[in-house]
């Protein structure tokens, strides 16, 4: 008979989840997308079932969930409350890779009352990052130490040899989400004080971050790191920063786009018809003409450059993007989405290219006798040509493992769960390492 698992979503992460679960004889997977063809493409390799489903249709959702033991929600997090409400009605367990949102938190009493397990935050970031943060923090506390600082940086990037464009970045999914994240403000603990960075200044705060000599990384902070003092039970920490890794040159390039207003998503007539890029920029920036010289003069009046060399590099990058050419824009009604269409044309992964995931935690430890120690936990993982991308594997495998453990009772509620305790984390870590070779290398560096 076996257990029934429903997977919602058609993103690039879904494939390893479906394939991994369907490889178990006692698990039957159904893939549900709004578009049946998408579900069929994902279900085909494993011979799983595919259906069309609109998650905003409560009765249709309830009907499908009632036939399943667990639902995996890999759709945008704004739809999770809808899925969880249906799961409460149908008494179905839930797994997601997203952060627990305030909207889900509000449903917690009903989740507990229904007796279901809703397991969240179990991908890469959030997910694998929690596993190894909690592990070291728990070890330090048990040994009588204090955690004085916690830095955590993660990046999904092209492998160095495939980072061959001016941004040093490629898109394995929608570029919109990547660019929107660059408009967030940031908040973190630094030396016992909360520091904030406005969205306008985020790229300007990026600084080099050393992990291994072979990589030229820069880092900048993510949204709100202050919450992790409580979530990781480290009230003693004076510095708590979680952030993003990119290759050097990325922040300055993005900052110039921000200065030009290219990350704005308010409706604009200029980007609503298929005119040439140089004409669109002339109108948008108020340049004298469509000549490259006049367009650059307009950019110069809006952007602030680090130095002449950086200016040359970024402007030649804009030329590579075709912003000064008479190539037609793909009109999307605003600057951001029109730019996204261009980036997605030029910056996709080719079939023979690999992505790379880098994650590092840095722990500043103070022992009871006053001595200090610095430890790192580091993951560098590459995608497989002809197989899963690293991002798909490092998000997908933890989701699949967590689902299996919810099914067999290793992870058990009822309630809203996330990987913040050794009881939940240790079995997931073990399976990730033993079965898939995914683990963080732990070192004492000082």
UniProtKB/Swiss-Prot annotation:
Catalytic reactions of this protein: L-saccharopine + NADP(+) + H2O = (S)-2-amino-6-oxohexanoate + L-glutamate + NADPH + H(+)
Annotated pathway: Amino-acid biosynthesis; L-lysine biosynthesis via AAA pathway; L-lysine from L-alpha-aminoadipate (fungal route): step 2/3
EC number: 1.5.1.10
GO MF term list: saccharopine dehydrogenase (NADP+, L-glutamate-forming) activity; saccharopine dehydrogenase activity
Pfam hit, one: Sacchrp_dh_C
Superkingdom of origin organism: Eukaryota
Residue numbers binding L-saccharopine: 98-99, 125, 223, 244-246
Protein name: Saccharopine dehydrogenase [NADP(+), L-glutamate-forming]
Species this protein is from: Saccharomyces cerevisiae (strain ATCC 204508 / S288c)
Gene: LYS9
